[in-house]
A protein has these predicted regions:
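Short coil turns that delineate tetratricopeptide repeat
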Residues: 14, 47-48, 81, 117
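Structural motif corresponding to the intra-repeat A-B loop/turn of tetratricopeptide repeats
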Residues: 30, 63, 97-99
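TPR-repeat structural position
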Residues: 33, 66, 100-102
Length: 135
């Protein structure tokens, strides 16, 4: 498996931010949030990429630790305020049945819908379409 390959490469590449991010992201996609968090915490030593924070937040959301997810995602918005993606993730977090926060949800939806993107993409269109569906 891909995860096994990354595990074998880890001793050689454990100080490379891009490798650690990809490894952590793969673990996240494989529903292994605790392992993913551990690897991504290492990646933070070598990179200030806010995507690391976003994936850590998504991992905490997977485990049901919504307050930790919120903290990491808010931290991502501080790192690069111009990015729309962390606000989109916060909107989805605030829509979680066990963490529902209608006021914060509306605030994040408005940011996603109104914020001018630095670079327009189909991903932005998709996020905006999806956020409109969230009730």
């Amino acid at each position: 498996s891909v995860e096994k390959e990354y595990r074998l490469l880890y001793p050689l590449l454990k100080k490379r931010a891009a490798f650690l991010f990809e490894y952590g992201h793969i673990l996240h996609k494989q529903q292994k949030p605790e392992e993913s968090i551990r690897i991504l915490m290492e990646a933070m030593k070598y990179s200030s990429d806010p995507m690391i924070l976003n994936i850590i937040g998504k991992n905490h959301q997977q485990t049901g630790d919504y307050l930790a997810a919120e903290r990491w995602l808010i931290r991502s918005t501080y790192r690069l305020p111009g990015r729309i993606y962390p606000y989109y993730l916060l909107a989805k977090l605030y829509a979680e049945p066990d963490f529902r926060q209608p006021d914060k949800l509306e605030e994040m939806k408005q940011i996603v819908l109104a914020k001018a993107p630095k670079i327009y993409s189909t991903a932005i269109e998709e996020m905006r379409r999806e956020v409109k569906k969230i009730k």
